[in-house]
Amino acid sequence: MSKLFWAMLSFITRLPVPRRWSQGLDFEHYSRGIITFPLIGLLLGAISGLVFMVLQAWCGVPLAALFSVLVLALMTGGFHLDGLADTCDGVFSARSRDRMLEIMRDSRLGTHGGLALIFVVLAKILVLSELALRGEPILASLAAACAVSRGTAALLMYRHRYAREEGLGNVFIGKIDGRQTCVTLGLAAIFAAVLLPGMHGVAAMVVTMVAIFILGQLLKRTLGGQTGDTLGAAIEFGELVFLLALL
């Protein structure tokens, strides 16, 4: 289990992980690591939240929110933001399904992808600022948002097909079973409930689950399945929806 966690941490983040900690784990078995996604999200969100708490007293709420979002992006290497941009470039191109998938593989940033990045990053900064001004616990909110967004991404893997013949997303999409999905969602729900007592955290997770499920169905209808890019888009979308649901 520990090898799976370290393997997933090095796979979906840029945090330094000694290679020996995940050595010997077959890449084809990475799908079992989906249950570690909420824990990894919890770690990323906690670090981002700590950055906010440290900087808030020094430079104020807006700049603290800006740097916490920046740190979160840096820790993932912009991995999920890149998926969001590619997904929006492809889906909003209004081309054929095959052409959309080709556009999503293009390394160049298009207009729709650029607009999506600007909107999501600015929205996160503004929502975090508003939550802080309302006295909400930012560290707990960010930790829960990152845990839930990565946990609910399982909804785009379970009983979905991979839209391409090959790619990194194929490790997870269509490869996880119902038990793994329930465990992943259950862990995310526990983190949300513990970090944000009462029904606040759980209610925000339910809203996020519904939003991610609908997004998954729309992407499935448009692209014929999911890709690594759509998983990244779902994680970014899930973070924003969860934070918005806390307002």
UniProtKB/Swiss-Prot annotation:
Keyword line: Cell inner membrane, Cell membrane, Cobalamin biosynthesis, Magnesium, Membrane, Transferase, Transmembrane, Transmembrane helix
Main location: membrane
Enzyme class: transferase
Entry protein name: Adenosylcobinamide-GDP ribazoletransferase
Record membrane topology: Multi-pass membrane protein
Pfam families: CobS
Cofactor: Mg(2+)
Reaction(s) this enzyme catalyzes, per UniProt: alpha-ribazole + adenosylcob(III)inamide-GDP = adenosylcob(III)alamin + GMP + H(+); alpha-ribazole 5'-phosphate + adenosylcob(III)inamide-GDP = adenosylcob(III)alamin 5'-phosphate + GMP + H(+)
GO CC annotation: plasma membrane
Xref: InterPro entries: CobS
Subcellular location, record wording: Cell inner membrane
Species this chain originates from: Escherichia coli O6:H1 (strain CFT073 / ATCC 700928 / UPEC)
Transmembrane segments: 34-54, 59-79, 113-133, 138-158, 194-214
HAMAP family: CobS
Listed GO biological process terms: cobalamin biosynthetic process
Biological or metabolic pathway of the protein: Cofactor biosynthesis; adenosylcobalamin biosynthesis; adenosylcobalamin from cob(II)yrinate a,c-diamide: step 7/7
MF terms (GO), sorted A to Z: adenosylcobinamide-GDP ribazoletransferase activity; cobalamin 5'-phosphate synthase activity
Keyword Membrane: yes
Enzyme Commission number(s): 2.7.8.26
Function: Joins adenosylcobinamide-GDP and alpha-ribazole to generate adenosylcobalamin (Ado-cobalamin). Also synthesizes adenosylcobalamin 5'-phosphate from adenosylcobinamide-GDP and alpha-ribazole 5'-phosphate.
Family: Belongs to the CobS family.
